[in-house]
Each structure stands twice: as C-alpha cells, then as structure tokens.
C-alpha cells in the first residue's frame, strides 16, 4: 500500500477510535429519546388510530424533515466533534510523521466516517424504535390520515410528513435525499469548526456553526426567501416542493450545487489553514 495512503488511513482510524470511545457519545441516546417523543410516537399513535400499519422507514424521513429535529441533529453532532481536530501534545509529532496534507486528508476521511456512523445510528434507531411493516412505498397512515381526520390536517404530526413530500417523491427517494443532504449539512458545519480550530480561534468556530443553524431555524420558520442561503432549508426535502403541483418551489439540484460550492470553498480554506498552521501554537490550544 502507498505510504501516503497508509498515513491518511492511520490518521482517520486513530481519530475515529478516539471519537467512538469518547464519553460524549452518550448524548446520542438523548437524541434518540427526542426522536421517539417528537416523531416516532406521534406517527405510531396515528397508526393505532387508523388501525393500519406504519412503514418502519417513514419515521426516519419524518426525523430528517422535522424543523425541530433537523436543528437538534446538527447540534448533537457538533458537540461530538467540537474538539476536533485534536490538538494534543502528540499532534506535532503525528503531523511531522504523516505530513500536513496527509494528516488533513485523514481528518476528512474521519469526518465522513463519523457522519456516516452518526446517520446510521439515527436511521437504525428510528427503525428499531418504530413498529409496523417494511415497504418501499408510503403507507396509508401517512397518505390518507389527513383525509380521514381533516381536523388534524394542520397538527404538528402532519407537519412531520407533509403532502409536499409524499405527493411528490417516492419513499426511497425521500430517504436517499434526506441522507445525502444531511450528510452534506453536517460536513459543512464540521469544516467551519475545523477551519477556526486550525487558525486557533476554536470558540468562534463553534459559535459560527451554531449561528448558521440558528439562522436556518428562524428563516425556515418564517418561510423567508433568504432561507435558501442557509444550509438548513437546503437539507429539508419537503421545502423544495409544492403540496400538489408537480413543479418544485426550488429544484432539488439547487441544494446539491449549493452544498458542493460551499463545501469546496470551506475545504480550500481549510487546506490554506493547514498550510499556514503554526506548530508552535499547538500548546496554546491544548
């Protein structure tokens, strides 16, 4: 195996082991409790009321499209990676052995590993905490509940899986788009935290990332046009579509381009920061 690749994978493996063994991972359990309370239980109550089975995949789509949970998930993930990249007494030695850019490439792989692991836990947790049948199509609990109980059409539970979603795209497409866009959202926030850590302003990086999440929450809640300038609106799939009309409000490809451009810019900024990284300042951030 190429030496550079070995160095990159070594960095990624080392960081990932530190990450999954960090006591902070217990906060994921708190997120699962919120998921069950805010999304899974309300959908199961509808299933019981209709006497029909819920699709066990639907709660994940609800979680990934709920304004409350799309706010909580990035916040939980930011808590988990807020200390990264690790700047300890061994960092100088580690970077000198691997090389700056091998070290950074390893950090990128680590981030993808941690994001995928995090989303897999959310997806698996939503399936295990739910009950019903497995199918690749939307269940009648989702598509017909509002017609049978019109007085509940504007309830919080209805907003979890609105008609903008199930009338416009298949369930599997909704799951894949939710996973892809949430992955991009978490990576973007991670790159912001990394950049400010690399220029030795760690606290501002976390503040900047939280501010972006907060701005997304506010603009999405008020349905302001400027919401498309923030990653949160671009992450919530149903916001892209009308309720009935097939024409999208904002094409989904816009959000993929948005994230691609934003991520490329942030990765380039991080590469510049790595190139200018001062080893003598490591002890100051330790």
Language-model regions: role of each:
Residues 35-82, 105-198, 233-260:
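Secretory targeting signals
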Residues 79-96:
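Transmembrane helix boundary and interhelical loop/hinge segments in multi-pass membrane proteins
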Residues 28-33, 203-217, 284-286:
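Central hydrophobic cores of alpha-helical transmembrane segments
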Residues 1-30:
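Aromatic- and glycine-rich beta-strand/loop motifs that create alpha-glucan
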Residues 195-199, 262-286:
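Junction motif at the cytosolic side of a transmembrane helix
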Residues 17-20, 101-102, 195-203, 277:
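Membrane-interface helix-boundary motifs at transmembrane edges
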Residues 32-40, 211-222, 237-240:
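Aromatic-anchored segments of alpha-helical transmembrane domains
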Residues 78, 89, 192, 269-270:
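Hydrophobic/aromatic residues in alpha-helical transmembrane segments
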């Amino acid at each position: 195996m190429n030496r550079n690749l070995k160095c990159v994978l070594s960095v990624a493996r080392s960081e990932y082991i530190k990450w999954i063994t960090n006591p902070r991972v217990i906060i994921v359990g708190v997120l699962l409790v919120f998921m069950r309370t805010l999304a899974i239980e309300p959908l199961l109550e509808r299933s019981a009321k209709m006497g029909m089975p819920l699709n066990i995949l639907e709660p994940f789509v609800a979680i990934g499209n709920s304004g409350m949970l799309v706010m909580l998930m990035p916040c939980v993930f930011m808590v988990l990676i807020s200390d990264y990249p690790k700047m300890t007494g061994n960092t100088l030695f580690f970077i000198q052995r691997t090389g700056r850019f091998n070290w950074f490439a390893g950090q990128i792989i680590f981030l993808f590993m941690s994001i995928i692991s995090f989303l897999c836990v959310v997806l698996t947790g939503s399936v295990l905490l739910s009950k019903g049948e497995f199918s690749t199509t939307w269940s009648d609990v989702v598509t017909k509940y509002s017609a049978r109980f019109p007085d509940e059409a504007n309830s919080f539970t209805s907003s979890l899986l609105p008609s903008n979603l199930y009338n416009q795209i298949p369930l599997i497409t909704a799951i894949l788009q939710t996973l892809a866009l949430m992955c991009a959202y978490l990576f973007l926030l991670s790159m912001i935290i990394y950049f400010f850590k690399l220029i030795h302003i760690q606290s501002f990086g976390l503040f900047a990332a939280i501010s972006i999440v907060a701005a997304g929450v506010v603009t999405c809640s008020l349905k302001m046009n400027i919401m498309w300038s923030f990653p949160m609106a671009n992450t919530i799939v149903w916001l892209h579509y009308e309720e009935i009309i097939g024409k999208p409000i904002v094409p989904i490809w816009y959000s993929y381009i948005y994230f691609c451009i934003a991520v490329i810019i942030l990765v380039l900024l991080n590469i510049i920061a790595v190139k200018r990284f001062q080893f003598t300042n490591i002890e100051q951030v330790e």
